[in-house]
Amino acid sequence: TLKISLFAYENTALHGLFDAWTASAQPVLCLVPEGRILPQVGQYFDDFAPQVGSDYVRGNLHVRVLPFVEQERYDLLLWACDINFVRGEDSFVRALWAGRPFVWQIYPQHDAVHLKKLQAFLSLYSRHLDGSASQAVQDLWRAWNRGGEGGATISLEQAWSAFVTELSKLKQHAQYCSRQWAENNLALNLLDFCQEIGTIRALKIEGQQT
């Protein structure tokens, strides 16, 4: 069983992603901490009052709704999963630390400015991957952040399939990146990244909503 954590903002791509997991050849256990995506999770299963403890099964997809957890316990969830869908900046940093393949949902901004920042990080994050693995990461991240539009020639479902196909490489890459980022102070590494893309922003710290 593939274990996936899902912590996300509202996203019109969710049901397409769930469709892919429902039809997956490998069983998927999706763990959803209580948050903004929860109403859409419930809607997929015709439950318009989802809550902590809700448990859903469709095809090869099994979804469990977890309580919202503090950061330290959230780290344990990230480490326990094979793939992590994370949102905002706090969870992004923790996903890097966790050393697991992840998909980042950047906070949406006016005029899609956030997509330029996303692509800048994608270029940095995937530069040590081979061609097919790099493409798989970029296609899925872009599809998730564009509400399911992976590009002119690829759907979210296709992007997910390619991502899973490359999962062994992506696990090794995530562990490599975690070690590299841990060698120096993580905040300094993030500052270097922000300078590289020409956008220095104050990172939201623990306790702030993202």
Residue spans for each PLM region:
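Active-site donor-nucleotide binding/catalytic segment of nucleotide-sugar enzymes
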Residues: 1-40
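Short active-site oxyanion
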Residues: 2-4, 28-29, 61-62, 80-83
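Catalytic donor nucleotide-activated moiety binding site of glycosyltransferases and closely related
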Residues: 26-67
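Short, hinge-like loop/turn segments at secondary-structure boundaries
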Residues: 48-50, 103-104, 121-122
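Short acidic (Asp/Glu) and glycine-rich catalytic loops that position anionic groups and cofactors
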Residues: 58, 96-102, 167-172
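A donor-sugar binding/catalytic signature common to diverse glycosyltransferases
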Residues: 68-117
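Post-HExxH zinc-binding segment in Zn-dependent metallohydrolases
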Residues: 117-129
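C-terminal amphipathic helix plus adjacent low-complexity
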Residues: 128-210
